[in-house]
């Protein structure tokens, strides 16, 4: 029987996260304090994040950052996650390509987001923080943060983008099961939310708006810090457990990827799967292609500008050097709520600028077609966000079929779609074009 899954034991969970900034040929430009226009300091960021995350955010020298023992113990509840050979998908496509996926959907909340939520909640508890706030789109990050906060004895408040709050009611229920206070954004509970609703009463929400509300609440609440699930360097750092495991598992499979693909919203799962492999491109040892698959309706990488911009709509965050559509950009109401963000993380933006990362945009219909194909071939219903990575992998595999090329493709299945079936209903009914 052909080997389908490549598994690592719990003692193979990485001991350290990989900090790609230490190896980048060109370092990212600094984030700026919006008041002084000077590079932000750990002290600046510590007003927003816990201090350890602020230090990790600005660390451009240490290649390896040790994972605390207690976080590794929590990782062991679901890590190491499987690397899977997608024989069924290969057969369905009639491609000579070998397709692998790293299955992050097996985590307790169904996605990769827990990898950083556990780390951020742990550091907050260690520093005496009692409350955390965050934003969430589809609810994957909100669910992860709610779960992690409960584990580490913190109170969590989550602002969920209104359209996703309405489209995905069971994610709200999951967050509430873990004890979080969940509020649709924009709301009347913050100045940022009130300002937006005054201008646009029917505003359906965006991640940029939800970030503004979460940041504002954190600033107003004693003993509270803001946490987030993507974009920032420390978040992507925590996600590198994905690629570090995948590197060992690909070795077990006796192959090395020619192309690695991740869906792209802010960059956390994309960086998580690609960065550990990318260091070998920096040295010239490998020539792997890295493809970021973003929604065509929110094309910050393929159509955005590289410039300084705020990470949120109200302008509460530092100024970030990134590919952006503008912090006031209002994305359309696609079902991949976790990808509806106007900008890209600073590290990925620099890597795009320097030619190490390619970007493709995927129409919503194509993403769901690929998601259904994958589900029928592999038995896993993917999250709408993950469907974008699958669609990009399908494109690559079809090129291999046309050229009769045998290539090895790896993508990150960032989450399952079992709480997203209303979106699939819309697709199956022919309502997604």
Language-model segments: residues:
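Alpha-helix C-terminal capping segments
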Residues: 119-129, 143-155, 176-177, 274-284, ...
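Active-site/ligand-binding loops adjacent to catalytic centers
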Residues: 66, 196-234, 242, 254, ...
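Claisen-condensing/thiolase-fold acyl-transfer catalytic domains that form or cleave C-C bonds
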Residues: 264-272, 364-430
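Positively charged, low-complexity intrinsically disordered leader regions
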Residues: 2-129
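A short, small-residue-rich loop immediately preceding and capping a beta-strand
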Residues: 116, 124-163, 256-269, 290, ...
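Active-site nucleophile and cofactor-binding loops and adjacent substrate-binding regions
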Residues: 103-114, 132-141, 232-235, 261-266, ...
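Active-site-proximal loop->helix
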Residues: 141-204, 300-310, 421-429
């Amino acid at each position: 029987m052909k080997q389908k899954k490549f598994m690592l034991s719990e003692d193979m969970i990485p001991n350290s996260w990989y900090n790609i900034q230490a190896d980048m040929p060109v370092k990212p430009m600094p984030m700026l304090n919006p008041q002084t226009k000077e590079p932000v300091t750990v002290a600046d960021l510590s007003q927003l994040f816990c201090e350890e995350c602020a230090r990790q955010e600005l660390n451009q020298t240490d290649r390896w950052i040790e994972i605390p023992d207690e976080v590794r113990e929590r990782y062991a509840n679901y890590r190491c996650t499987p690397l899977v050979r997608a024989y069924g998908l290969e057969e369905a496509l009639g491609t000579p390509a070998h397709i692998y996926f790293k299955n992050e959907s097996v985590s307790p909340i169904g996605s990769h987001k827990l990898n950083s939520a556990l780390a951020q909640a742990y550091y907050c508890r260690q520093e005496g923080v009692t409350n955390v706030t965050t934003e969430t789109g589809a609810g994957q990050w909100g669910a992860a943060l709610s779960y992690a906060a409960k584990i580490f004895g913190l109170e969590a408040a989550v602002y969920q983008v209104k359209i996703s709050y309405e489209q995905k009611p069971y994610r709200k229920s999951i967050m509430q099961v873990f004890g979080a206070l969940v509020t649709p954004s924009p709301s009347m509970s913050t100045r940022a939310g009130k300002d937006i609703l005054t201008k646009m009463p029917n505003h359906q929400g965006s991640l940029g708006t939800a970030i503004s509300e979460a940041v504002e609440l954190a600033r107003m609440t004693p003993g509270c810090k803001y946490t987030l699930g993507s974009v920032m360097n420390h978040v992507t750092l925590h996600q590198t457990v994905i690629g570090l495991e995948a590197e060992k598992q690909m070795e077990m499979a006796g192959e090395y990827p020619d192309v690695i693909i991740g869906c792209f919203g802010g960059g956390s799962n994309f960086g998580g799967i690609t960065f550990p492999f990318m260091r070998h491109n920096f040295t010239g040892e490998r020539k792997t292609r890295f493809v970021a698959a973003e929604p065509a309706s929110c094309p910050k990488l393929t159509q955005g500008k590289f410039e300084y911009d705020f990470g949120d709509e109200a302008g509460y965050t530092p100024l970030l050097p990134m590919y952006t559509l503008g912090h006031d950009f209002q994305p359309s109401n696609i079902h991949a709520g976790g990808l509806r963000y106007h900008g890209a993380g600073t590290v990925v933006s620099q890597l795009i600028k320097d030619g190490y990362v390619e970007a493709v945009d995927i129409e919503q219909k194509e993403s769901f077609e690929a998601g259904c194909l994958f589900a029928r071939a592999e038995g896993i219903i993917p999250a709408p966000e993950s469907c974008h990575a699958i669609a990009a992998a399908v494109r690559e595999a079809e090129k291999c079929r046309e050229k009769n090329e045998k290539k090895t493709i790896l993508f990150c299945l960032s989450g399952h779609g079992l709480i997203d079936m209303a979106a699939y209903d819309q697709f199956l009914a022919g309502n997604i074009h």
